[in-house]
From Swiss-Prot:
Source species taxonomy: Bacteria, Pseudomonadati, Pseudomonadota, Gammaproteobacteria, Aeromonadales
Provenance organism: Aeromonas salmonicida (strain A449)
Subcellular location: Cytoplasm
Gene Ontology molecular function, alphabetical: translation release factor activity, codon specific
Name of this chain's protein: Peptide chain release factor 1
Modification N5-methylglutamine, positions: Q237
InterPro entries tied to this protein: PCRF (IPR005139), Pep_chain_release_fac_I (IPR000352), Pep_chain_release_fac_I_sf (IPR045853), Prokaryotic/Mito_RF (IPR050057), RF-1 (IPR004373)
Gene3D superfamilies linked: 3.30.160.20, 3.30.70.1660, 6.10.140.1950
Gene Ontology CC entries for this record: cytoplasm
UniProt xrefs under PROSITE patterns: RF_PROK_I (PS00745)
Amino acid sequence: MNPSLIRKLEGLIERHEEVQAMLGEPGVASDQDRYRALTREYAQLEDIVHAFQRFRQAEENLEATKLMLEEDDADLREMAQEELPLAKSTLEEQEQALQVMLLPRDPKDDNNCYLEIRAGAGGDEAAIFAGDLFRMYSRYAERQGWRISIVSCNDGEHGGYKEVIAKVDGEHVYGRLKFESGGHRVQRVPETESQGRVHTSACTVAVLPEVPEAEQIEINANDLKIDTFRASGAGGQHVNKTDSAIRITHLPTGLVVECQDERSQHKNRAKAMSVLSARLQAAEDERHRAAEQSTRRNLVGSGDRSERIRTYNYPQGRLSEHRINLTLYRLGEIMEGDLDCIISPMIQEYQADQLASLAENS
């Protein structure tokens, strides 16, 4: 392993001991924000410390195996010759696992996020597919122990959604969902199709990390046009009796955000402002990414409708993830929320790209 990486790891081990000592200080739990930050850092460092211990053990095993090759005993030499390939591959695996842990982390990966799904080409069928996608993500959120709640929606005329925006709260939400942004295409026979012909429809998905209040872009109140209106849809007796729903227009960019999820106008306004802040921050991040002119492919999509990332082919039960040339014939399970079979390979490919970039620059 590169000596500079070893030095970095030794520094992290020292930091692990420092954090452990700080967590043992009397009264540390009285400052909840500091305590949570230290606990989170300790858990991350603990994983690296254990991985480094496994790497050192693999190094020792390889050295011991090489020494056995020099033994006088022919049986020992033969045994060492058999064990050598496994000892080498184990060390390589442990080294790669450590390198992945040392990759620069996106600080937003631990954030909650907003999930936006919009029907595109395909009319009613596109809206129905948007509903299917929302159900898929809702099932996935349940599996992960996350909480998903609708912020605003515009129902389709024959089911599904013309547009739905949801908030997803939980552990590592953005880090796992960020690869979902882009164009999703469906190929299937609509229920209304009497001739049995396969139609193609599309939806766009955008995943935006929630911006913590302390980091939110400053928005000038004079740049906002705020309208109130009566909520529509499910909600019992309260519906359409008060103007609790909020529509905020950001005049410089033309961005419009609506929220009618809460009965309180104040809460709806706070939610809408949070979505607006996330969209403005995402637009700013996208400008920075474009300015970097990176030669590496960007697996994290922008949510642009022209950026087709995935095709769902119902007649063949096939899902095609175009960015990494992944084809899976388990569409039924995926639509029921079994998304890890796509998300995990995407993360691995993303990490491989990062490792390749580090190797080029080292």
